[in-house]
Amino acid sequence: MEDITQLLSDVLEDLVESELKQFTRQLWIGVKPGVEPIPRGKLENKDRQDVVDSMVQQYSEDAGTITVQTLRKIKQNERAKRLESNLLKVQSQGQENKQNSEEPQPIPQIISQPIQQIISQPINNAGSEDLQPIQADWQRPRQIIPCSQETKNTLLKAHGDDIYTPRSGTQRKGLALLITNIQFANTQHNRNGADRDEENAEWLLRSLGFAVIKYRNLSGKDIRRAVENFSKRREHEDADSTFIVIMSHGTRIDNKDAIVGVSDDVYFIEETFSHLNSVNCPALIDKPKVILIQACRGGQSSGVLAQDSVFASDSWVHMEKDFVCFMSTMPNTFAYRNPIEGSFFISYIVDVFCSSAHRDDIMELFRKVTLRMEKDQRFQGQAKLLPCIERTSISKRFYLFPGL
């Protein structure tokens, strides 16, 4: 925050007195709807540092963005552009420092040999290795099969305009949002094993080339704020696609799927579509938006594994373009989670993506996950566990092209 404060001070120092008056006046009359004005008494006849202090006190981490918007309001476009660039550099450096201060994680390596060579043999013979069920002692592969340039060229040639084509660069670019609730206000609702899901999901997203924004233990209100803030990230403008992964307890209220926050308030999943639709997130127009939900959806079951449900409690009304939502279970059904190893849904996704993302599009990957879970004998009868695709509006083939 100190770096941002210094940047704001430097910008205001460059303003002449008349420009500073325009700037402070804009702050007290209001920069834009939804941004609370700063009281006039805190700004009038104050020096530049006082103005900066008032902005930081009022807007906290948003002070930099609001300064950029205010500069544009008073036609200081070059200064706004320069400040925006400097803010991104500070933010990037902050994320890098945070990562460096954390315990280093093994860097995933991309290999060419089949994924089946590096994981344990399946518990039974079900035919194709691609269709084997996840065994109880499954461990996440540390590798992902890359897509060769030849395979990519073949797919592009075969399907042409029917593919979401990566924009540029050596790797598909995009942001991913990862929210995992583990510890709840009511400790009886704690989701043991969910930390493994978080670790596995983050590893997969980073291996696929996505920058991951991660949150843990959020209330329903905080989930709403996190998704809304994510939808406003400027990085989406240069992105090819995005992933949103939310893992918590879940329920259904008035035929609507809801995520349960750590304070037992809820976040309705349909809000994610609203925040990321063409109106509220124009930067993601015509780009795939993949939503993965590990949570219960109401219902009852006699299964013996941990269940991602808290409340004892159809379909959405409107559609948006280029969305697909893959949920861990059918409506009115529990989702299961191993208290040590994490959820079967996330484990299957990681396993299938590692072995098949180099050649299959996203819908085929989801089909393989569903088929493998359907064949898993642990989830037959009353303890049924079958994921489903909801509210899809994907209009083209979405290939992840790992490694390219």
Swiss-Prot record:
GO terms for biological process: defense response to bacterium; innate immune response; pattern recognition receptor signaling pathway; positive regulation of apoptotic process; positive regulation of inflammatory response; positive regulation of interleukin-1 beta production; positive regulation of neuron apoptotic process; positive regulation of protein processing. Induction: Up-regulated in response to pentachlorophenol (PCP), a toxic pollutant. Up-regulated in response to bacterial lipopolysaccharides (LPS) and bacterial infection with E.piscicida. Up-regulated in response to bacterial infection with E.tarda. Its main location: other. InterPro entries: Caspase-like_dom_sf, Caspase_cys_AS, Caspase_his_AS, DAPIN, DEATH-like_dom_sf, Pept_C14, Pept_C14_caspase, Pept_C14_p10. Activated by homooligomerization induced by direct binding to cytosolic LPS. Residues 1-171, 301-316 form a propeptide. GO terms for molecular function: aspartic-type peptidase activity; cysteine-type endopeptidase activity; endopeptidase activity; lipopolysaccharide binding. Expressed in the spleen, kidney and liver, and highly expressed in the gills and gut. Residues 8-80 form the Pyrin domain. It is found in: Inflammasome; Cytoplasm. One of its GO terms (cellular component) is canonical inflammasome complex. Keywords: Apoptosis, Cytoplasm, Hydrolase, Immunity, Inflammasome, Inflammatory response, Innate immunity, Necrosis, Protease, Thiol protease, Zymogen. The active site is at H249, C296. It is an enzyme of class 3 (hydrolase). Thiol protease which cleaves IL-1 beta (il1b), releasing the mature cytokine which is involved in a variety of inflammatory processes, and mediates apoptosis. Component of the NLRP1 inflammasome, which plays a crucial role in innate immunity and inflammation. In response to pathogens and other damage-associated signals, recruited to the NLRP1 inflammasome in its precursor form following the recruitment of caspase caspa. Its subsequent activation causes the cleavage of the midformed pro-il1b and results in il1b maturation and secretion in the extracellular milieu. This is Caspase b. It comes from Danio rerio (Zebrafish). The gene is caspb.
